[in-house]
């Protein structure tokens, strides 16, 4: 990956997430809120995932997803004393009916929504995988 391939995904996935959380902090703290993040499987530390990211020329996205996962954990640790929960749902695969669906996707958007709802209500696990 070269720097130009990495910069935009990092700005979108990491920098914008951090800026958004910072802007919402007063409300998050006062309401004991939650930040729920969608992430993708390309950020997983796995040699097969790495090979796929290289093959699909998605190294920037893979790096951004890995960095976003770390940011979720750091933010949760920083904000837990204030009663704010930060967690992520990692989607492993294409979602049925989306542009990425080649007709073989079985992952339903409603299943992802249910995982988010569970994550929000339980506030136990920082990262859950679906797909």
PLM features per residue range, with description:
Residues 1:
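Glycine/small-residue-rich loop that forms an oxyanion/phosphate-binding "nest" at active or ligand-binding sites
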Residues 4, 57-58, 101-106:
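Short glycine-enriched, charge-decorated loop/helix-capping segments at active-site entrances
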Residues 5-11, 19, 29, 34-73, ...:
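Catalytic loop of short-chain dehydrogenase/reductase
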Residues 16, 20-24:
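Hydrophobic positions on the long internal alpha-helix
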Residues 66-131:
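C-terminal helical subdomain
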